[in-house]
Design a protein with these regions (language model features):
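FAD/FMN-dependent oxidoreductases across multiple families
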Residues: 230-320
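Beta1/beta-strand and adjacent pyrophosphate-binding region of the FAD-binding site
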Residues: 2-16
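Glycine-rich FAD pyrophosphate-binding loop
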Residues: 25-45
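C-terminal helical "tail/cap" subdomain of flavin- and related membrane-associated enzymes
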Residues: 311-397
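Conserved N-terminal helical subregion
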Residues: 2-5, 55, 59, 63-165, ...
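Conserved N-terminal glycine-rich FAD pyrophosphate-binding loop of Rossmann-like flavoproteins
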Residues: 38-58
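Conserved FAD-binding catalytic core of PHBH/FMO-like flavoproteins
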Residues: 134-145, 151-263
Length: 397
């Protein structure tokens, strides 16, 4: 069966898909979201949207909706240098926001439907046929269906099938770390402050992210060579014990917690596509590129992808040209953020002897001048990331 074509089809219905679909539908585009999940469930995902990501959400017209229905502002952060007021110390002047990831997804998908987007849940995409003039998506939901569009967007995450179907070449950079997370109640701490702390001598990093309904998402990054297997709620005591090693006071903050969601871990490696557009198919978010999750840049990057593609589609009547323009910009900001996160990983997380030598040189200088640490995690990829920035961070200047 062949259906009438849409302007835009998204494979996946998460953050990037819904944000882009809402923006396009408000401009009069005919948009279809195909989401295999009939209901989003709690998994270990990002739930802290840093300042530059909030700016992208505002540009796409969804920030106020999130704050109204599922999110809260979390303006303070502690990274070992004392509490920092993020909106007062970033160019955007906006507070980071936090939320439950599945609740955010449901809110945005409902808004997409209100905006005129056709949403199909429980449908399984079976393939994509790239074509610069009319790509086709094949789905199954009781029957096979071929659906054409001007543009197909793969928004189906780090294990993207769309990436494979459209024959994009993936590039991988494995990292010797795992990243685990769990949803907790009973954390002792300020509900307007996120904690993000490293212990590089042990290769450990923790984050505690307060969200709505007095819940906290707790994260732990740890070396793969330590023999830990943090999978399943029966491993909660191990998760908490390892987290307590990062810094004084962490164990006390977890003394009375209860687990209210799954405990899971995954690899902290990088995976990306160069130039994530060809022949009528674009990739955004984790489908286009997965950065090291330790640094929490996945959601801001997803919203940047959605906004840049949205702007390109509005600017060019030739959507093939628009797709290439999006992909060109994506490569630049994705690789800039990847580069900076690599520097931060070396200095703050790598327990190896070379990194230890760098810390001995760099940390005394940083203690005297914290502007040596580049602020891309909050300010975004427009900040400088040249050789001078690297050398100042690593104490070479």
């Amino acid at each position: 069966m062949t259906s009438q074509p849409f302007d835009l089809i998204t494979v996946g219905g998460g953050l990037g898909a819904s944000a882009l679909a809402i923006a396009m539908a408000r401009q009069g585009a005919r948009v279809l979201i195909i989401e295999k999940e009939e209901k989003f469930r709690d998994r270990v995902r990002g739930e802290y949207l840093s300042t530059w990501g909030v700016a992208e959400a505002r540009a796409l017209g969804i920030a106020d909706l999130l704050l109204q229905d599922c999110a809260k502002e979390c303006p303070w952060i502690e990274m070992g240098f004392g509490p920092r007021n993020v909106p007062e110390t970033t160019a955007q002047g906006m507070s980071p926001i936090t939320y439950s990831h599945p609740e955010m997804q449901e809110v945005l998908l409902a808004e997409a439907e209100k905006s005129g987007v056709q949403v199909r849940r429980g449908s399984i995409v079976q393939g994509i046929e790239p074509n610069a003039s009319r790509p086709v998506v094949t789905t199954r939901n009781g029957k096979d269906e071929r659906i054409g569009a001007r543009l197909v967007i793969g928004c189906d995450g780090r294990g993207s099938a769309a990436r494979k179907w459209a024959q994009f070449e993936s590039h991988k950079n494995a990292q010797p770390f795992q990243f685990a997370g769990v949803l907790l109640t009973g954390v002792s701490g300020r509900e307007d402050l996120t904690t993000f702390l490293f212990n590089p001598e042990l290769g450990l990093v923790i984050a505690t992210v307060p969200q709505t309904k007095r819940r906290w998402r707790a994260y732990l990054g740890y070396p793969v060579n330590g023999g830990l297997a943090l999978q399943g709620t029966e491993k909660l005591k191990v998760f908490l014990a390892e987290s307590a090693k990062v810094a004084p006071g962490v164990g006390e903050s977890y003394a009375d917690v209860e687990c209210v969601g799954p405990l899971a871990s995954f690899e902290a490696g990088e995976n990306w596509v160069n130039h994530p557009y060809h022949d009528g198919v674009a990739l955004i978010g984790d489908a286009a590129g997965t950065n090291d999750p330790t640094f929490g840049q996945g959601m801001p990057m997803t919203l940047r992808d959605a906004r840049v593609l949205f702007d390109a589609l509005r600017a060019h009547s030739d959507w093939d040209r628009a797709g290439h323009e999006y992909a060109r910009q994506h490569d630049q900001y994705f690789q800039d953020m990847r580069k900076v996160c690599g520097w931060l990983r070396t200095l703050f997380q790598d327990p190896g002897p070379e990194a230890q030598a760098i810390r001995q040189r760099a940390m005394p200088k940083i203690a005297e001048d914290q502007t040596r640490v580049p602020d891309h995690l909050f300010g975004g990829p427009e900040l400088p990331c040249d050789e001078t920035v690297r050398a100042r961070l690593l104490g070479e200047l």
